[in-house]
Amino acid sequence: MAEAKSAPIFRNRVIDKKQLKKLIGWTFAHYGTAKTAVVADDLKALGFRYATRAGVSISIDDLKVPGSKAELLESAEKRIQETEDRYTRGEITEVERFQKVIDTWANTNDELTDRVVKNFRESDPLNSVYMMAFSGARGNISQVRQLVGMRGLMANPQGEIIDLPIKTNFREGLTVTEYIISSYGARKGLVDTALRTADSGYLTRRLVDVSQDVIIHEVDCGTSRGLFVEAMTDGDRILIPISQRLLGRVTAEAVLDPSTDEVLAEAGQDINEDLANRIEKAGIKKVKVRSPLTCEAARSVCQKCYGWSLAHAQMVDMGEAVGIIAAQSIGEPGTQLTMRTFHTGGVFTGETARLLRAPVAGTIKLGKKARTRPYRTRHGEEALLAEANFDLVLEGKGRKETFAILQGSTIFVQDGDKVAAEAILAEVPVSGRTKRTVEKATKDVATDLAGEIRFQDIVPEEKTDRQGNTTRIAQRGGLLWVLAGDVYNLLPGAEPTVKNGDRVEVGDVLAETKLTTERGGTVRMGEDNGSSTHREVEIITASVVLDTATVKAEASQGREHYVIETKGGQRFNLLAAPGTKVTTGHVVAELIDSRYRTQTGGLLKYSGVEISKKGRAKAKQGYEVTKGGTLLWIPEETHEVNKDISLLNVEDGQLVEAGTEVVKDIFCQTTGIVSVTQNNDILREIVIKPGDVHVLDDPDTAAKYDEGRLVNAGEEVFPGLTAEQLVWAEAVDGTDGPLLLLRPVQELVIPDEPPVPSQDSSQESSSRSIRLRAVQRLQFQDGERIKSVEGVDLLRTQLVLESEEGSSQLSADIELLPDSKDPETLRLQLVIIEPVVIRRDVASDTTHGSTHTELRVKDGQKVKPGAVIACTQIQCKEAGVVRGIQEGSEAVRRLLVERERDCVTLDLDVTAATQLQPGSLIVAGTQLVDGIIAPESGEVRAIAPGQLQLRIARPYRVSQGAVLHVEDKGLVQRGDNLVLLVFERAKTGDIIQGLPRIEELLEARKPKEACILARRPGVAHINYSDDDAIDIQVIEADGTQADYPVGPGQPLIISDGETVDAGQALTDGPANPHDLLEIYYDYFREQLGEDYEAALESLRRVQALLVNEVQSVYQSQGIDISDKHIEVIVRQMTSKVRIDDGGDTIMLPGELHELREVYNSNNTMALTGMAPAQFTPVLLGITKASLNTNSFISAASFQETTRVLTEAAIEGKSDWLRGLKENVIIGRLIPAGTGFKAYEESLLTDVDGGYEDRVYDDDLADVVIDDRAARSYTLNEGRDFSRSMTFAEGESMILDDGEELIDDSSASLRNLVDVDED
């Protein structure tokens, strides 16, 4: 090649990024790495040298704004104004207006971008900005557009497009509003990028984990299977040409030229670039090639099925870790994929629909076959929708043009219309993957003016859902009018004081609300709380006051509390603080009384005391005493210890003095006999019982006092001992023998009725009276032992609030009142209050009008139940006529005053206009009489000679199926929601794009709204029932019929009578891959009658779907990834089956096994005549597949470490260390690259001669071959995979090869050289 004789040819061409790629690729393919590096280096030097010379940089003068920008914007503004006018006239709905505005701006933006480029190209091709962007050095067209065109439409944080575009560019500068809108979108971009990197990194990690053990292990697995490769298309566009998909593949069968039957490629031949181009030129649509998906090599992929290594453009080496390369190739572009597509509110560009334009002026003819129905486009324009395929004919001057109209096309012309050249005739949807699918969306419409509602042509229909909520839906669309007027919101409970048709002046009362008292009582004006909206009036319905007792504030331990002192010298603690509320039965105060306080714990006995039965349950409060008597109290000191027995310093039954340390750190306070309770060497409690001790000789006496009993004064205890006072005699075991203990008893007397301070109560109404009652409550029951060291209160005397009604729960306020005679003295008062809230006067507030409130009572006045306390009036703000009070409706919530300025008077001769009568509604722009058009929309009020009075109104278009929020003749305030428009918004392709979609595919997730799939092939019939439900019947070849009910909102994508295949989608939406696999498997098992083949075929279908779906996501973002990478990953996801029935094999139902493992085991079973295993193929997501690998070390290092390891331990698994990850973790040489074959079993045969005479121990210490040992084995016995390249003498020089290098369309080496697109 170097010695070629011909002189080099010089070509003067522009070489941009794409050409550069090709140049380097070409050099690499023909001359290898070293020379390519030199060429690249030289190019770099050249580039830098000239970049330095040229000094290209952007200055503000380089940003040239095209002169035609102003007129472009002007025409756009004009179109938008027209749209706004149509909206104001009620010709289009809010949604259609929005769509039209967005589309107008999007088109303007595109048009402007083209002008910018054209402007540069024609007037200043050496402009720095232009050169940078178009050579691919820096920047792209959309950035240039923002610099010198317009910034365009931005999305708000919810992803909806803001219909105010940024019309300026960065050169001119943004206005404040534009700047804020602009930063919305910019921030969103940044956040997206930040989220994207994390997501993408995790995706890469999962991919690496699932495929890390795929290594090229053998040369040829010998399979005859393969995949058919065809060009990848999207509608009419070719995304990936067949030549590009074939490059670097190995053919599975011979490729023949269809026209000449010449053999283009043998079976098993790898396809290089020339061959790929020849196949494409020959017009071959499908080629069967080997693929990692069909490779039969166990646990890996063979060289032939993988094909070229794309880095070297030659067959892949043995031991190449293709799994990891695949994972990185898919994961790396992840960051470039957009996270979410902006929900553009249905802005879609021209790619989803082809516009048919008239080539010449002429007349339209729709033939006899044309089946169309009227259709309203998304911009609210009237058009026709084709219901079947037919031809549209345009007859021009001397020529006839025919256009094929497909079903579903939108036709913008009628039969017989005359059209100009370049007029748009129709919009033909593009068939193929991007079906123009729709989703339901809603939009609220709020009114711009207050007034009265009128329906015109709207037929409302009430629908009740399962929960019983009623919604009103417009069955027929029409206009919803709002007739202007001043609307007043009435306060709750207000009654109108005027009638429809009354004339009112400013300040007249329109409605009033009366505030009444429910129970009556004494009026007390609250202090003014300073609130601007209301004040409170209190009505005291009942009260009680302690008229002789005084209340004092005392401070104890730094806390202030109140004490009530009675004339009798009793002192009560006030428990409820002043200003709080207490309910019936609540304790208000408690007597301060030390008579019933003990020194220590002890035993309590009742003598004649009775307690209330019902109080027993409420032991929290204590037990209420119903009859007085005496309490008998036998003191004893109890320590609850719960410590180790070794800490005890005294013995059971020992006599101790007060102050003795009975247990470590515990001292007793009384003198007496110790009683110790212990349990399992744990000291539970110590009781010290005081009293007189007597030694007992007689065991009978001991038995008599064993339980302990009361001995009255003067009674004989035992012979020779008489009790001097009331005692409690109890026998105890002393340290030296039995003792009798006589314990002192204290007697406490309880009176029948506790003393109560005098009280004076005032009752306003007979129904309520309240008083304070004194209650004595015992804290402990008869015979209870109180374990305590300190003293306890045995009885409390409390003041409790009571009401006559007994049952009802009243709440009273506690207040302190200064005495009327002596202001220094405070008295306790309890009052029951009914609060009445009175609104303040509000100066003319927008919705209520002026309210004026007047009080009808004075402080201290007594009022009867039902008396009016205050009255609030709504006053008129502007003179006019009252309207809109609906007769017969329950409560009137709003009323309307029609003012002078809500009407306009037109001077015209009305006699000519016959169609006008009072009450008819006219849209602005309507011709009233010849030459006079209505300036405003409105309702005809009155017709007088020479005059027409219009009431201003505003029409809103309501589409069919919208949800109505208002009723006919109802009243609305400005800003109220009138209607919720339900519309269909076009989506292009899948809504989920980018990373989330890839993740959904590779994790094999069930899509949210999956489509309905046909389970068996047949002919589809579509039945529409009454309630919009659709039923699809598929009638199979043998006449069986399957029903598929379709839910609401699932658009069909098949037509009536169409033939469908098994697994074909009947409705729109992404397919659920799991269902698809199941459907295919059932179908093929029936067709082929063999499980293994059926599983392979069904898996192959799902694999193809996954590969294409992933490819299409990357393609839509303009990223090229070779199919084989995706195939390697998908192979790992689809290699397992679930066992349904183990048969006679050792497999268990529910286990996951490799398909070929099960196949081999079933073959063995067949030979021996035993039952094979039944199985179903499964599709595993990448995470699940990673956790189900054979290597537990790899799985555990990925996720759920503990679960994986415990499972492996229980099953006693061994890890064969086949993948890279396991070996890395253990620290061995990885079995790829140079380490490949170091661990192959075959090595044991060809060991180096020098090793043969060694004698080895039978039980080697280390089973794992060590790296050092592995090195000494001969590794050069394998095949030689390097290849030499020679070039024929006549091959062309580098710049001499005609069009090949510079031609854009040949995407020859795009795959080989991965240069970053950005």
Swiss-Prot record:
Gene name of the record: rpoC2
Pfam families in the cross-refs: RNA_pol_Rpb1_3, RNA_pol_Rpb1_4, RNA_pol_Rpb1_5
Protein known as: DNA-directed RNA polymerase subunit beta'
Free-text cofactor note: Binds 1 Zn(2+) ion per subunit.
Reaction(s) this enzyme catalyzes, per UniProt: RNA(n) + a ribonucleoside 5'-triphosphate = RNA(n+1) + diphosphate
GO molecular function, one term: zinc ion binding
One GO BP annotation of this record: DNA-templated transcription
EC number(s) on file: 2.7.7.6
Coiled coil location: none
CDD domains registered for this protein in UniProt: RNAP_beta'_C
Function: DNA-dependent RNA polymerase catalyzes the transcription of DNA into RNA using the four ribonucleoside triphosphates as substrates.
Cofactor dependency: Zn(2+)
Organism, scientific name: Synechococcus elongatus (strain ATCC 33912 / PCC 7942 / FACHB-805) (Anacystis nidulans R2)
Annotated keywords: DNA-directed RNA polymerase, Metal-binding, Nucleotidyltransferase, Transcription, Transferase, Zinc
GO cellular component, one term: DNA-directed RNA polymerase complex
Residue sites binding Zn(2+) per the record: C221, C295, C302, C305
InterPro entries given in the database record: DNA-dir_RpoC2_beta_pp, DNA-dir_RpoC_beta_prime, RNA_pol_Rpb1_3, RNA_pol_Rpb1_3_sf, RNA_pol_Rpb1_4, RNA_pol_Rpb1_5, Rpb1_funnel_sf
Keyword Nucleotidyltransferase among UniProt keywords: yes
